[in-house]
Each structure stands twice: as C-alpha cells, then as structure tokens.
Curated annotation (Swiss-Prot):
Name the UniProt record assigns to this protein: Na(+)/H(+) antiporter NhaD
Biological role stated in the UniProt entry: Na(+)/H(+) antiporter that extrudes sodium in exchange for external protons. Can also transport lithium.
A single Gene Ontology CC term: plasma membrane
Subcellular localization, as worded in the UniProt entry: Cell inner membrane
Membrane topology value: Multi-pass membrane protein
Transmembrane segments: 6-26, 39-59, 77-97, 120-140, 162-182, 203-223, 224-244, 289-309, 327-347, 364-384, 392-412
GO biological process: sodium ion transport
UniProt GO molecular function: antiporter activity
Disulfide bond found in the keyword field: no
Keywords from the UniProt entry: Antiport, Cell inner membrane, Cell membrane, Ion transport, Membrane, Sodium, Sodium transport, Transmembrane, Transmembrane helix, Transport
Top-level lineage group: Bacteria
pH dependence of activity: Optimum pH is 8.5-9.0. Inactive at pH 7.0 or 7.5.
Length: 414
C-alpha cells in the first residue's frame, strides 16, 4: 500500500472531529484559521519540493545519472573501492540532490556490478543509506527535515554548515568498521557508453542558480524560499523552450557529422530523439510522497490544535533536558518516519538554542539510518535490492551505526 493512503484518510478523520468539536463550542473561526495555516505550510513545502523533483527528473532524463553510473561501473574498481566510492558520492551528492534519489542511483551501481554477491550488496546498501542520510542532514536541499527547519526560520542557511563535520563523522565511523568486512576481490567489469543528452550540464547549472535564488529570497528579501524556487522553475521552462526551438538545427548538425563519419548507430539514435518537455518532468514527481506530506502536515496540525502535542512538548522539552529530548527524536525517527517526527517538533515550537535546533535536525535526519525502515532511502533500497538488502541484514549493523553518534553530541552541544 502506498504510504499516502492511510495518512490522507487519517487527516480527513481528524479534521472532521475538529470541525464537529469546535462547532459545538461556536469556535468554527478558530478551526478554520488553523486549517488555513496548515494548508499554507503544506503549499510552501509542496511547491518547493515540486521544483526540486522536477530538476532531478530533468537531469535524469538528460542521462546525467546514467552517465555517472556507467563511468563508475566501467572503471573496474574492486569491492572495497566500490564500497567507499558509492558511499562517498552518496554523501557528496545528497546535499544537492535529495537523499532518496542519491541512494537509488548508488544502489543501481552496486546491483549492476555485484548483484550476485548478496553479502557485499547488503553492506554497500547500508553504507549508502548512512551516507545519503548524513549528507542530507547539513543541507536544506538534502533532506525534508532539514528543509522544514530552514523554512521555519529556526536556523539560517549558513548556520547549517557546522553540521558538516558531525555528519561526516556519523558516516565515516560505521563505514570504516563495515569496510573491514568487505572482500578484497574484484567484480566483473561491464563497459557501457552513455552519451549525455543536449543541455544536461546547463540544467545542472540552472539548478545551482535556482538554489542560489531561493537562498537569496530568504536571506535578502526575507521571503519564503519557495518563491525563489518557483522563479527557478521558470529558468528551466525557458531553457526547455530554447531546447525545443533549436532541436531541428541541432539534429541536422549531428546527422551531418554522423553521415560524414559513417556512424549508422548515431543516425538511428537521432531518429528517436524526443523534445524536452518541462511539464512531463513535473508530472513524474513523486506524487505519493507529496500527498504523504499533506497527510502528515494536516494530521500533526490537527493533533496540535486538539492539544496533544502540547502535552508531549511539556514532557520532552520542560521535564527533560532538551539535548536528551532531541536525541530521543533521532531514536524515534528510526522507528517512525522522520518527517512526521520533525514536523511534530516544529509544531510544538519549543524554546531552544540554535545548537539544539541543529542537534534535532541532525538526529532526525540521520536517526533513520539505525533501521532500514527509518528513512525513505532505506525503504527504497529494500525494494531495489530485494532479498539482498533486508531489515534484519541492516539490523545486525545497528550497534556499529550507533557508534557514529558517540563523537557527535559534544561537537553539537559545544
């Protein structure tokens, strides 16, 4: 069952209860104002993620990820090098792309090179999940939880950078220990040539420009970052228009070169070129995920209005030390999806220092690495490497993953 279905139903039931209860006390205006507030929060998140997903889909359609995958597969790396390379790239790419896309890309490389070695696949997938979650924790563009903290205004964009070292430690410590169990042999090399489609590199530059625009709107104009992201979507739309208008000239030029070189394969490939369509990229966004976020926002917002989150907040952030409360948020993120957990914390809005907001951002972001079901990356990889990367295969390494947290607390709290 898709994850959006139960939360959409739950959101509807909660707000029916709210509507009935507040009507009994003649406070329909209070319920309506709360509903509109939650809808606005969701709209900002929806449009922001829609633009980011559209850019990722555009890069995928232009064969950027396929080219990276072919390069890695064709290099003939040994298992140990492949283990470190896929993990390192997951850590580096996830702050720009989202951690789910990054994890799936690296998993595809692992499966193509060593799909017949289940022990290595399991270790490599665990490593990728840890790296992708850790890499996404120090960038608002790498993880939904980090994005929500930034959009809420608790931490400025530049203030996330102190999370880089703790995130790196959180990845490197378990990776170093797991690498000891990776075989020293080499898998069979597969050579595959992938040609980038026209405009691939320029779309990457436009995505970087879009990120800069979103940050500028937030830092300089004090507008929500989503306004800058929507402007960035216009960059892609105009570039898509340019690609379509110049397609005929580009094909004629490439066809002439193919004829001159006697390359029949290139001519055949040119005949199947499909014009770039931005709106098709929009339609291929992860709509189940986007609808899931709606359910989460509305469920948590409803429970907050009914007073349940205030009770939890009084226990966690009044009776407990905020540091340990935030550590528990990370542990809870391993069992429950980290998005509703973080949104609940943001809705509670406890009075905390910037250091504690950074701590809860890190723990919620990387806490999901403790279990395979704790993050979208882990769940997706269990499907991509079905039967080889499993819940219990990941669970065996949970104590090792937890060691990555030990050096992190003093760094953040200090």
């Amino acid at each position: 069952m898709r994850k959006s279905k139960p939360v959409l139903l739950a959101a509807g039931l909660i707000w029916i209860l709210i509507g009935y209860t507040f009507a009994q006390h003649h406070q329909q205006d209070v319920a309506k104002a709360a509903l509109e507030h939650n809808l606005l929060e969701y709209a900002e998140l929806l449009l922001f993620l829609l633009v980011a997903m559209t850019y990722i889909n555009a890069m995928e359609e232009r064969k950027l990820f396929d080219a990276l995958q072919a390069w890695m597969v064709g290099k003939g790396f040994g298992f140990k090098k492949l283990f470190w390379l896929t993990g390192f790239l997951a850590f580096v790419i996830s702050p720009i792309a989202d951690n789910l896309t990054t994890a799936l890309l690296m998993c595809a490389v692992v499966m193509k090179v060593s799909g017949d070695n289940p022990r290595f696949v399991n270790l490599a997938c665990i490593n990728i999940v840890i790296a992708a979650n850790a890499g996404g924790a120090f960038s608002p563009f790498g993880d939904i939880t980090t994005l929500m903290v930034w959009q809420a205004g608790h931490v400025r964009f530049s203030e996330f950078m102190p999370l880089f070292v703790p995130s790196l430690i959180n990845y490197v410590v378990p990776a170093f220990l797991m690498a000891l169990f990776v075989p020293n042999t080499k898998p069979n090399t597969i050579h595959e040539h992938v040609e980038l489609k026209r405009g691939a590199r320029r779309i990457v530059l436009l995505f970087v420009l879009t990120i800069a625009t979103a940050v500028s709107f937030h830092a300089v104009l004090h507008f929500p970052p989503v306004v800058g992201m929507m402007m960035g979507l216009a960059y892609l739309q105009f570039f898509g228009y340019f690609l379509r208008k110049t397609l005929k000239h580009s094909l004629a030029k490439k066809a002439a070169m193919a004829i001159a070189n006697g390359d029949d394969h290139a001519l055949k490939r040119l005949g199947s070129v499909v014009p770039f369509d931005v709106f098709h990229r929009v339609s291929r966004a992860e709509w189940d995920t986007l609808l899931f976020f709606y359910g989460v926002v509305m469920c948590v917002g409803g429970l907050s209005l009914l007073g349940y989150l205030e009770l939890v907040s009084n226990v966690m952030y009044t009776q407990w030390n905020p540091v340990w409360a935030n550590v528990m948020v990370g542990v809870l993120s391993a069992i429950v999806d980290n998005i509703p957990v973080m949104f609940a914390v943001l809705t509670m809005d406890p009075s905390m220092s910037t250091g504690n907001w950074l701590l809860v951002t890190l723990t919620a972001g990387v806490g999901g690495s403790l279990l395979s079901i704790g993050s979208a990356a882990g769940v997706a990889l269990m499907g991509a490497a079905r039967g080889q990367y499993t819940f219990f295969g990941h669970l065996k390494w949970t104590p090792v993953i937890a060691l990555g947290y030990a050096p992190v607390l003093p760094l953040i709290c200090g």
